[in-house]
Design a protein with these regions (language model features):
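Helix-to-beta-strand junctions that scaffold the AdoMet/dcAdoMet cofactor pocket
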Residues: 1-2
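Conserved catalytic/acceptor-binding region of the Class I
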Residues: 5-73, 83-94
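C-terminal lobe and adjacent flexible extensions of AdoMet/dcAdoMet transferase-like proteins
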Residues: 54-57, 71-154
Length: 154
């Protein structure tokens, strides 16, 4: 619909980088190989490109990070399962050995743990908005065409 708005939200960027790096390091050490155990994430540039390809105008894409602290990696993983945020990657190892999981939890605590004994989990939120084109829609002005300086206003 002309001049229709699209509002979107998704997790992306470096979401769960602490968990991702801990799992990769433990798996490399214990099993001699790597498998993705956290779903891949997109970044703001990809979201902007997607909005452009979908022919949205007047786009804005913003990102904010939230850090949530958990008692250990196990509570974080349980929360992710409860949210239905299990790994959706098709070509991955179907399970992780117990010793690898224990090593990942120890690595997580050693690399990212707080003095209080908690582990942080970073969630990078991507917010997006775009408008469908319309003949009456406002157009962005040409750079440098302003009649007043921002310095004068501030």
């Amino acid at each position: 619909k002309p001049d229709g708005v699209f509002l979107g939200y998704m997790l992306g960027g470096d979401t769960l980088f602490e968990l991702r790096t801990s799992l990769l390091l433990a798996e490399q050490e214990r099993q001699g190989g790597l498998s993705n155990h956290v779903s891949p994430m997109t970044d703001t540039r990809d979201v902007s490109s997607l909005l452009t390809r979908a022919q949205f105008t007047l786009q804005t894409v913003d990102m904010d990070e939230i850090v949530v602290h958990y008692p250990s990696m196990y509570e974080l993983v349980q929360d992710l399962r409860d949210m239905g945020e299990s790994n959706a990657v098709v070509n991955r190892r179907p399970y992780m050995h117990r010793e690898t999981l224990l090593a990942a939890a120890a690595t997580y605590q050693a690399l990212h743990g707080t003095p209080e004994g908690h582990v942080p989990a970073t969630f990078a939120q991507i917010f997006m908005i775009g408008w469908k084109p319309s003949p009456d829609q406002k157009k962005a002005l040409r750079p440098g065409s302003a009649s007043h300086s921002l310095k004068d206003v501030l």
